[in-house]
Structure formats: structure tokens, C-alpha cells
Amino acid sequence: MLEMANQLSEDEEYSHALKFYKSILQIEPSNIGVIIDYGVTLQNLGLYHQALTTYDQALQLQPNNTSALINKGSILHTLEKYTDAITYYDMALQIDGDNPVALVYKGLCTAEIGNIQLAIKYFKKALSIDNEFELARVSIDTAKCIMKS
């Protein structure tokens, strides 16, 4: 059932995937991976508040789960709550200081609140950890263009 849910999600059949994740959670309500996948699926459907609640459930089970922290931050970013999002990225970075996703997302929020130079530092650090991380590369190029204009 989990393979089917993941495949549907990969195929962007989020509504169908959601049904499978719900069924799995009825059997395994504490399966952290499924809870997070369910949250991601809700997020992909634009159901941000439901996804936030789902990530909160994951964090109640595992407060140091970096995936749940980063995903919660990404929703807060989408909702333009940049300072709140940064708080969650910082929490993830306290657990895993070399997490390139948390660094780039923190950089994106930092840029949104107007500190482009600091954002570039986060993008550079992410690239030093994973030099093939495309989002970091694109973000640093965009930030540099903004600085020049």
C-alpha cells in the first residue's frame, strides 16, 4: 500500500495518494515516515493548514525530525511567515548543521526579508556541502543578480 501511495505521489496524483496514506495511518498511526509523506501530499494539494497540523503530529512523536521541521518551515515560508519559517530551519540546523536543504530554505527566507548578502552565505554553505544542489546554485545566481541591480 505504501509503494502505491508513493508512486501516486510521484505521479502527482496527490488526491489518490492521500487516500492510501490515510489508510496506512489507520493501521500504523505512529509511522513517522507516512505521517510526513501525508503532510507533503497535503502541502502539494495546497492544504497548508492541514499539512501544518500533520507536521505538528510528526514533531510530537519525534521533536528532532529534520524532515518534519524543514517541511513545516517550507509551509510557513509559502504563507509568507518568513521569521517563523527560519525558526524551524534553525531547529533543523541545530540537529544537522550540514543540511543543505535547510540552509537553502533559510537563505530564501532571509532574502525575502531583505538580507540578500546573508542569504548568499547560506547558499554558498549549502553548495559547499552539496555542489550539485541545483536550488542552491539557482538561488545564489538570482541573489547575485539582485545585488547588482
Residue ranges and their predicted role:
Residues S9, I36, Q43, I70, ...:
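Position-specific recognition of the canonical hydrophobic site in helix A of tetratricopeptide repeat
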Residues M4, I120-K121, L127-S149:
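Terminal, low-structured helical/coil segments at or just beyond the last alpha-helical repeat
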Residues I32-G33, T66-S67, P100-V101, E134-L135:
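Helix-start (N-cap) detector for alpha-helical repeat units in TPR-like alpha-solenoids
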